[in-house]
Amino acid sequence: MNNNNNNNNNNNNNNNNNNNNNNNNNNEEIKFNLNINEEKDDEIKDLYKVIESLKKELFEKYKENLLLKENLDQEIEFNKVLKFGMFEKNKEFEILATQLGILKSKYGNKKCDIEVIIISSDDEDDDNKNKNQLKDITTTTTSSTTTTTTTTSTTTTNNSSSENNFDDQNKEEVVFCKPYNQSDNDEDSKNNSKDLGYNENNIGGDATVGEYNSYVVKKEM
């Protein structure tokens, strides 16, 4: 199973240089990383259709601001990364939360990784904080375990400690991360960022739109 996921880092690194071109205020950037096992049964094909529909919806609305223009006419492929810039505030959070709620309920036991990171800036004062957050949220996938860990501390982090972020490596979980007013202490940050507003039957929990800066849905291989 793990052999299908050895090219994750290369695919991700090819797109990282596109993050630094957006200097406008009140921006949102969404990084969408879909990683599906090669085994494509009917339900997995349905999953592709849902994601493709979401991509087209976002493309039609924001095609003038797309950062990766070479991906516009391509179907979502294994471990494809799409990035969009200069979004209206909070609109895509609602769209993605709805779509991910569908995916969680329908494909919770499937062998796939679904990760969405939403980074937003609500006002001019948050612009620099938002740029720092872009640097601090790091995504890595290892070929040995095919795990994806997302860290949100404001200090140097260790991405290999995925067990600190997820209780059960075989269980799909949702992690909400607070805006950057949490403790500078690494351990406190990890604890504060876990399971905030999470509800088993409601992917958004009791959270209001825009309350959380980072949003991750995950199923380990």
UniProtKB/Swiss-Prot annotation:
Residues 1-28, 140-205 are annotated as: Disordered. Residues 1-27, 140-162 have a biased composition (Low complexity). It comes from the Eukaryota. This is Putative uncharacterized protein DDB_G0287413. It comes from Dictyostelium discoideum.
